[in-house]
Amino acid sequence: MRTATITRETKETQIYLTLDLDGSGRSEIDTNIGFLDHMLTLLAFHSDFDIKLTAHGDHENSGMDPHHLIEDVAISLGKCINEALGDKLGIRRYGSFTIPMDEALVTCDLDISGRPYLVFNADLSGNKKLGGYDTEMTEEFFRALAFNAGITLHLNEHYGKNTHHIIEGIFKSMARALKQAISIDETKVGKIPSSKGVL
């Protein structure tokens, strides 16, 4: 069973997350940020991960920006992915997927390499808010996820106008690429997918 559970409590956030990489796309998401809930639900559905997440942050009572919560959710999700993958024996390792989301086109390319890195090319400047979600936090979300999951992650917006569509394309393409990368390669069962013998 490729599963993981994390409880993360700081002075700013309280997070409980369970993850099953070999699920069916079911999710129960509650971050009190509607747009983030929507994106994480899409991530679960398109990756076939089962995700149960409850997250609360200092912004709920203070009126502060939910920056800490968004980043800590990504940290927790990244840690769970890394833990659930375990020794990574037999995984395909690489994933690549392009999503057309109406007028927007977004590609995710990733390598479960153990060498975390993020390349993020999407124009989300302008301090837009979507349901309490600061769109500029999207890059920070994926940086935290990549560095805690041990993933080399490239996210590229080829073009697009609608911010919601661009971000949705990013989450969906990431989900589909992850689904590819964590799947088992029947020709490499029981083997580390690296010529070095370690990831």
From Swiss-Prot:
Keyword Amino-acid biosynthesis part of the UniProt annotation: yes
PROSITE patterns cross-referenced by the UniProt entry: IGP_DEHYDRATASE_1, IGP_DEHYDRATASE_2
Matches recorded under InterPro entries: IGPD_sf, ImidazoleglycerolP_deHydtase, ImidazoleglycerP_deHydtase_CS, Ribosomal_Su5_D2-typ_SF
UniProt cross-references to Pfam families, sorted A to Z: IGPD (PF00475)
Coarse class of the protein's main subcellular location: cytoplasm
Keywords recorded for this protein, A-Z: Amino-acid biosynthesis, Cytoplasm, Histidine biosynthesis, Lyase
Disulfide bonds, paired cysteine numbers: none
Gene Ontology terms: cellular component: cytoplasm
Classification via Gene3D superfamilies: Imidazole glycerol phosphate dehydratase, domain 1 (3.30.230.40)
One BP term from GO: L-histidine biosynthetic process
Catalytic activity as recorded in UniProt: D-erythro-1-(imidazol-4-yl)glycerol 3-phosphate = 3-(imidazol-4-yl)-2-oxopropyl phosphate + H2O
GO molecular function per UniProt: imidazoleglycerol-phosphate dehydratase activity
EC number(s) given by UniProt: 4.2.1.19
Protein's pathway: Amino-acid biosynthesis; L-histidine biosynthesis; L-histidine from 5-phospho-alpha-D-ribose 1-diphosphate: step 6/9
Top-level taxon in the UniProt lineage: Bacteria
Subcellular location: Cytoplasm
HAMAP family: HisB
Alphabetical list of NCBIfam families matching this protein: PRK00951.2-1, PRK00951.2-4
Protein family membership: Belongs to the imidazoleglycerol-phosphate dehydratase family.
UniProt-recorded name of the protein: Imidazoleglycerol-phosphate dehydratase
The organism's taxonomic lineage, starting at the top: Bacteria, Bacillati, Bacillota, Bacilli, Lactobacillales
Gene: hisB
